[in-house]
Amino acid sequence: MAIEYLGLSSIHGPLVVLEGVQGAAYDEIVEMTVDGKEKKLGKIVEIYNDKAIIQVFESTENMALRNTRTRLTGRPMEVEVSVDMLGRTFNGIGQHIDGLGPIRGEKKLDVNGKPLNPVAREYPRNYIHTGISAIDGLTTLIRGQKLPIFSGNGLPHDQLAAQIVEQASLGGGEDNFGIVFAAMGVKYDVADFFRRTFEESGAADHVTMFVNLANDPVIERLITPKLALTVAEYLAFEKSMHILVILTDMTSFAEAMREVSSSKGEIPSRKGYPGYLYSELAAIYERAGIVEGIDGSVTQIPILTMPNDDITHPIPDLTGYITEGQIVLDRTLQGQSVYPPVSVLPSLSRLMKDGIGEGYTRKDHQDVANQLFSCYAKVGDARALASVIGEDELSPIDKQYLIFGKAFEEQFIGQDPHENRSITDTLNLGWKLLGLLPRTELDRIDTKILDEYYHPAQTEGEADES
């Protein structure tokens, strides 16, 4: 029979201290009853002799030192999982909020997951189609990869996340695909935008949503991504599905960690974040991957807003060390009404080279991507020179690069929020834009591929003659 403890020794924000505890374990879940009626859940985060520090998952406002009873469950935080979770919406601690009743779970799993043996991992291959040219063409998302989006306040990362959910699919017509979407610290209107968008597009049927609102307890934000990944791992590794996990906003997760760490009186590290921020982020990001001998995969797109657009801030900085590339959104492109405002040059996908090309996308994919990167870099040089000497004084080739740069931003990077481009459309568009430049400038493409795909753009005079 479980022992029930009456009263608390102190309350500090989301943390409460229980004394005289015996047999408690780190990360153990406790059930707390307030005034004999309201029930709350908490987690033991520290143990000193007979003292246990407990993080309460809900508000502690109505809790007092004498009106609370605490019972140790002897178990870690667990979630009931089932394939029926697809198409359902839950709050930040896994309780259903869509009015469709509780889930009949097939089993209970520890939300902390089990670390994947590096030897058991299979190297990620095959791409995930997003329908967005800047991603599919230049920073291709590979199954089993973790590819974050670095955004900033006011940039359209929510709209981009919704578009990815609407359009994401597996190449080759496979249908064993699902999405787990976790929103942390979002405002109600943003959460409502996601719900409406998924329902109107028809994507909701294969999406499991976890929503932690801005007015929900801060501590829930530390649980939400773990719940989402536990469900994703179950669907991927036990039901052989390919699962895309979108986590937004990881900055809210890190700030929640800072707040809880501060209330525990821990010594802060960079920018006030705890010294274990790196290991906590790694514990989430490293749950992506493919296990050898299992058909399923877990792919992650964590989204984070960089404070003051600072890519050296601890959150994007540490994220970059752990993940396999990044997609960076740019405020200048946003000001030019380019959507999605993906900054091509600092963006990359480290696993892209092994999941594209013949047998995956198209044989010219890598060459086209390399050449577009190279040409767009020269656009920056031409624009810098034009700002000094004036556009009229530029050489003819520099003027051609300016024309290419404008067309590239408006036509290749820019697209309608509901436009779903196939990989063939994306690559053909890339060749069309490269046709604005003379063949002699295309030095990153194999000669045989140039002969097959390159067609120079017609000048106005040539078009009139034809």
Outline where the language-model segments fall.
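P-loop NTPase nucleotide-binding/switch module
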Residues: 68-70, 77, 84, 97-146, ...
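A generic structural motif
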Residues: 13, 37-39, 49, 106, ...
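P-loop NTPase catalytic core
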Residues: 137-465
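Mid-sequence acidic-hydrophobic segments that form the walls
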Residues: 92, 96, 167
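N-terminal accessory targeting/assembly segments
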Residues: 1-88, 93
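Glycine-rich, histidine-containing beta strand-loop boundary motifs that form or position
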Residues: 20, 56, 93, 101, ...
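Residues that form or immediately flank small-molecule/cofactor binding pockets and catalytic motifs
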Residues: 13, 49, 94, 116, ...
